[in-house]
């Protein structure tokens, strides 16, 4: 490396807020099944604390040795519905508490995998887990839950979509004293992926190895700073600039992943190329979109700008990493992005425009607060719309929505830390009840039949 490259990397970290958002250790719990729930939970606790005992220490060592901030150390596990259904337990709240205790024992920030994959239907374990979600999230601190309700191969399980609307409302009501904040630990997916290092949707897929290290990068501020140097240039130049910047960002992630894998003696899984914003000024995906040329995020042209950004990040990042996976693109979580928050407050960005943006970006409607009296059927309708985008376009989509109990449009929910502030956004006043109450399954699209 020449001196300019070294100085450029230092500048990315110190001035442009480049960081490694997460080192996530995925752990298989498939050998923790037992007909006795207590025995199963003991095996789960012992395995997590054994495999992850050095995760935080190693993350801090790498941060110190290389000077790259590593914001979170996390764990993902096999979906608990698959593990717990071997037992005769009638609810799985104790499994969530076990995950919580194990994660706290090793010092990680979050643990994901209180999850169920119900895109075609529910097993006994899936049904019990879904019923357990509200109490599980209410009685734990750092456990995250996810449910996959659709896939491009199987269509959309509308029975599960209906149920998730009610579950989200139940979670919100149990945390009414904090305006429904516990909902930020729950995400509903279509086309969920098995190697996601980001929360709340991370789980360790059944096709994964015994234990792996997945790394999620960040760096919206670096991309914006690069684009400031090409003001007024054609889109070709914009795309090339983003690609080159994404390459540099991803190289840092590859270095951290390789070192973590070596020090922990755990196989390297993937680098997730996602641009993950924070509420801090200068670390916003919305501000990148505005730098590309729209006056405010949400104005006409926003979706096209986001599509360009997402594609260029993938093209640049994929050349810098040996294995790419996860969600890999640009995140647009409203409460976690200073520019998104400003756009919503100014009226430039609404729920419908956000839905359009999810057609071309990494995930979906993320960290969105809606009025606390929003009907469960309306929430289910929002989930169904987002799932349809994912299923038809063969991409991952998701909904992480917070019914802000006791709040209305114009109020704001304060989450604090990386979770930021969510302005309460208006939703349609027209009912989706008759649509949601049909139940059944929406069939998979014609182009899903590829065999």
Swiss-Prot record:
InterPro entries: UPF0210. NCBIfam families: PRK05313.1. Signal peptide: none annotated. HAMAP family: UPF0210. This is UPF0210 protein CA_C0479. Belongs to the UPF0210 family. Coiled coil: none annotated. Homodimer. Gene3D superfamilies: 3.20.70.20. Pfam families: DUF711. It comes from the Bacteria.
């Amino acid at each position: 490396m020449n001196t300019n490259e070294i100085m450029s990397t230092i500048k990315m970290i110190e001035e442009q807020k480049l960081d490694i958002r997460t080192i996530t250790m995925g752990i298989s719990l498939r050998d923790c099944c037992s007909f006795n729930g207590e025995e199963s939970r003991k095996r789960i606790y012992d395995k997590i604390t054994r495999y992850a005992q050095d995760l935080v220490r190693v993350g801090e060592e790498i941060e110190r040795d290389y000077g790259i901030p590593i914001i979170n150390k996390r764990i993902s596990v096999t979906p608990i519905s698959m593990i717990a259904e071997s037992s005769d337990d009638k609810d799985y709240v104790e499994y969530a508490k076990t995950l919580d205790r194990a994660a706290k024992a090793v010092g990680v920030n979050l643990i994901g995998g209180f999850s169920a994959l119900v895109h075609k239907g529910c097993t006994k374990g899936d049904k019990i887990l879904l019923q357990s979600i509200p109490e599980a999230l209410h009685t734990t601190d750092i456990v995250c839950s996810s449910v996959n309700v659709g896939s491009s191969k199987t269509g959309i399980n509308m029975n599960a979509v209906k149920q998730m609307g009610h579950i989200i409302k139940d979670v919100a009501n149990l945390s009414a004293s904090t305006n429904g904040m516990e909902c930020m630990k729950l995400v509903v997916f279509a086309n969920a992926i098995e190697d996601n290092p980001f929360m709340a949707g991370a789980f360790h897929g059944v096709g994964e190895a015994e234990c792996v290290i997945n790394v999620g990068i960040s760096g919206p501020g670096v991309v914006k700073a690069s684009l400031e140097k090409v003001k007024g240039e054609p889109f070709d130049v914009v795309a090339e600039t983003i690609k080159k910047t994404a390459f540099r960002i991803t190289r840092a992630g590859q270095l951290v992943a390789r070192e973590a894998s070596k020090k922990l003696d755990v196989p390297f899984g993937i680098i997730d190329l996602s641009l993950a914003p924070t509420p801090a000024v200068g670390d916003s995906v919305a501000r990148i979109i505005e730098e590309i040329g729209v006056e405010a995020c949400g104005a006409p042209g926003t979706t096209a700008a986001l599509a360009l950004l997402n594609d260029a990040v993938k093209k640049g990042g994929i050349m810098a990493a040996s294995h790419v996976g996860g969600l890999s693109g640009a995140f647009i979580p409203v409460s976690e992005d200073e520019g998104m928050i400003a756009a919503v407050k100014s009226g430039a960005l609404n729920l419908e425009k956000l839905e359009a943006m999810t057609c071309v970006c990494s995930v979906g409607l993320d960290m969105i607060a809606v009025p606390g009296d929003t009907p469960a059927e309306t929430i289910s309708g929002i989930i169904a719309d987002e799932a349809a985008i994912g299923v038809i376009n063969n991409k991952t989509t998701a909904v992480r929505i917070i019914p802000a109990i006791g709040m209305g449009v114009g109020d704001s929910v304060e989450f604090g830390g990386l979770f930021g502030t969510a302005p309460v956004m208006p939703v349609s006043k027209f009912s989706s009840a008759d649509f949601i109450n049909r139940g059944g399954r929406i069939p998979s699209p014609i182009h899903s039949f590829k065999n």
